[in-house]
Amino acid sequence: MSRTKKTRRITDIMPARKTDKPKQPMPKLGGGKNRKLTRYELDAQAREEKRKRKHKGLPTGSRNADPAEQKKAVVKEVKDPRIGSRKKVPLMVEFVNQPEKGRTIKAVPVEPIKPTLSPEQELEQLENNECLNQLLDDLEAGKTLSAEDQKFMNECLDRIDELMTELGIEYEDEEGDNGDALLRQFETMDINKFR
């Protein structure tokens, strides 16, 4: 953007003319005689005129709005009664109108969330169940079990069977024949075959 030369206005160079000045009534002091103003009074008048000339424009900023407009803006707004209530809200449900009738709120049945275990973990827990092991020991010893104990044992054994089939685990034969057969096969094996 190019610079433009500032030009001087005539009012900047030349003082205001007598014809441009508004006429002010001269103070009359001494019984109707027109007297000449003193130097001090003339200076005061000149300062006053200069101040008036200086402040010709409007005041700056939005804060300096007209007081009449501000009064119009101060009109009280109708507030919504729902906002800003000071009334305390009860946190517990109470029967305020009918406390003596003994009404109670029925509890909503919540199903307990069972922790889901992996099949391996569940099988390990069932195999290490002390109660089940005790019942199996009692049964092997020839003791008779109560109906509840028998039912519990059957449920646990059925669940163990399901988990073993799900995991693909087969029952181990507890007979010692397999171990003896392997030992006999090892002893009779010809080592020279593997050379």
From Swiss-Prot:
InterPro entries: YihI. One of its GO terms (molecular function) is GTPase activator activity. One of its GO terms (biological process) is ribosome biogenesis. Signal peptide: none annotated. It comes from the Bacteria. Pfam families: YihI. Residues 1-81 are annotated as: Disordered. Keywords: GTPase activation, Ribosome biogenesis. Residues 9-23, 38-49, 66-81 have a biased composition (Basic and acidic residues). A GTPase-activating protein (GAP) that modifies Der/EngA GTPase function. May play a role in ribosome biogenesis. Belongs to the YihI family. Interacts with Der. NCBIfam families: PRK05244.1-1. This is Der GTPase-activating protein YihI. It comes from Mannheimia haemolytica (Pasteurella haemolytica). The gene is yihI.
